[in-house]
Amino acid sequence: MTADELRSLIASGLACDHIEVEGDGRHWSAVIVSAEFAGLRPVQRHQRVYRTLGARMHTDEVHALSMKTYTPAEWAAHPH
């Protein structure tokens, strides 16, 4: 799997304002900004992202995914 493929999978299941994905083909890190995260605890945000990936989380395609999740307001206030 490529970073673009992973980015597309996440975007297909979650309305995102911004997505950054980096990784080596199995171990990934992502920054995801979505209004859908409003009012959710961090673990709930991660669960929303995991749902977009479905069974791929249990294969070698996505062995590990580290996430930073933000609402648009949090992202605007975040130094980047």
Stretch-by-stretch model annotation:
Residues 22, 31-33, 68-70:
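Solvent-exposed beta-strand sheet faces enriched in polar/charged residues
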Residues 26-28, 37, 72-73:
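Short active-site-proximal "capping" loops at secondary-structure junctions
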Residues 47, 51-80:
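C-terminal structural segments of small proteins and small subunits
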Residues 32-46:
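A short interface-forming secondary-structure element
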Residues 1-16:
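N-proximal, solvent-exposed amphipathic alpha-helical segments enriched in charged/polar residues
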Residues 16, 37, 54-55:
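Short beta-turn/strand-loop junction motif enriched in small, turn-promoting residues
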Residues 13-29:
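Short edge beta-strands and adjacent turn/loop segments
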